[in-house]
Swiss-Prot record:
This is Uncharacterized protein B0310.6. The lineage of its organism: Eukaryota, Metazoa, Ecdysozoa, Nematoda, Chromadorea. Sequence repeats lie at residues 67-74, 85-92. The keyword Repeat applies. Residues 67-92 are annotated as: 2 X 8 AA approximate repeats. The keyword Repeat applies. Keywords: Repeat.
Amino acid sequence: MLRVVLFAAILVFSIANSEIIDKSLEQSGPIQDSSNFALAVNGEELPTDIALEGQSEVMIRAKRYYGCGCGCGCATVAAVSPVPCGGCCGCGYGK
């Protein structure tokens, strides 16, 4: 008998709690649409270091060549990426 009373009390508490949550969600208003926020990214590439840190809302304005202006044009990275200058991209240009 005690189990039935405890089960009924838990059931009533759960129903009351769910109604309170539903009412609070209705009063909080609609969720803002994120399509109104603009993010400008030139090119398809996003630096993995920035993406891993959760900084995906970075304005990328221009690109540079991997070899810091070597002009080979094969591998480009974003100008704001933290990639160190390691010479050209391996195509042999600038050696």
